[in-house]
């Protein structure tokens, strides 16, 4: 079963928390749709910022959005101007007050979303997929990962028949719930069609009690931006990877 299910959803409530933290009551459907629109807009708007994760927390009158990114300077802008502009744009999606926090991913080579999207962009740029995958594996293992597995599927090299190829190094124990495994599925649009790219990264094992709702907040003195553009990197830690 561990080989088939999404490794992230399989570990929810064990070593992984939810990306949406709120209680909706009778408005659950509307809030869920709003979250989907926010994520879709941010992923398109911040496509060049290497966004890894978007965490949304809601109170009665406030929506707190934490954007985990490898390139926080692109989102924050000079003096926090880009954050202010982003807040104004998001007010078209929700009628609540918005607070945006920026969290920097310290080691993007250990983040499956960033790795998968980088491979997809290279393949779309006509770089050989084997070269892109082998470079990603080497960079990830060099940064201290215990293992990585990458699968690419589709009409590879323009072949008539679609096929799948898998490359792996180290260990990725999908059945071990305490194993901190990050996963992502990305797509690369080529002239011959879509290529699917799946990435599994094992960042070690988590022992003891795990905080499922990581605290991204941080004091203003160590923040990276203005008006809610804070970097909460110190409070979000894992066994093997300080994201």
UniProtKB/Swiss-Prot annotation:
CDD domains: KH-II_30S_S3
Region (Disordered): 214-243
Gene Ontology cellular component annotations, sorted alphabetically: cytosolic small ribosomal subunit
UniProt xrefs under InterPro entries: KH_dom, KH_dom-like_a/b, KH_dom_type_2, KH_sf_prok-type, Ribosomal_S3_C_sf, Ribosomal_uS3_bac-typ, Ribosomal_uS3_C, Ribosomal_uS3_CS
Keyword flag Zinc: no
Keywords from the UniProt entry: Ribonucleoprotein, Ribosomal protein, RNA-binding, rRNA-binding
Disulfide cysteine pairs (residue numbers): none
Gene Ontology BP terms: translation
GO MF annotation: an example: structural constituent of ribosome
Record domain KH type-2: where: 38-106
NCBIfam families linked: rpsC_bact
Role summary: Binds the lower part of the 30S subunit head. Binds mRNA in the 70S ribosome, positioning it for translation.
Family the UniProt entry places it in: Belongs to the universal ribosomal protein uS3 family.
HAMAP family: Ribosomal_uS3_B (MF_01309_B)
Subunit structure: Part of the 30S ribosomal subunit. Forms a tight complex with proteins S10 and S14.
Protein name per Swiss-Prot or TrEMBL: Small ribosomal subunit protein uS3
């Amino acid at each position: 079963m561990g080989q088939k299910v999404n490794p992230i959803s399989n570990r929810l409530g064990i070593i992984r928390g939810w990306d949406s933290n709120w209680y909706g009551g009778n408005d659950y459907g509307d809030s869920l749709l709003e979250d989907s629109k926010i994520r879709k807009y941010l992923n398109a708007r911040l496509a060049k910022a290497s966004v890894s994760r978007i965490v949304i927390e809601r109170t009665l009158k406030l929506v707190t959005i934490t954007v985990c990114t490898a390139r926080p300077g692109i989102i924050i802008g000079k003096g926090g101007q880009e954050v202010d502009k982003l807040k104004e744009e998001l007010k078209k999606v929700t009628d609540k007050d918005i607070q945006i926090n920026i969290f920097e991913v310290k080691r993007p080579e250990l983040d499956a979303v960033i790795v998968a999207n980088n491979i997809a962009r290279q393949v779309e740029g006509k770089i050989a997929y084997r070269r892109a995958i082998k470079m990603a594996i080497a960079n990830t293992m060099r940064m201290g990962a215990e293992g990585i597995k990458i699968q690419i599927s589709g009409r590879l090299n323009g072949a008539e028949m679609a096929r799948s190829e898998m490359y792996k190094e180290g260990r990725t124990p999908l059945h071990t719930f305490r194993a901190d495994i990050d996963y992502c599925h990305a797509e690369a649009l080529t002239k011959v069609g879509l290529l699917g790219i799946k990435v599994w990264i094992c960042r070690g094992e988590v022992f003891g009690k795990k905080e499922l709702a990581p605290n991204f907040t941080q004091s203003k003195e160590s923040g990276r931006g203005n008006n809610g553009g804070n970097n909460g990197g110190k409070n979000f830690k894992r066994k093997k990877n300080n994201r």
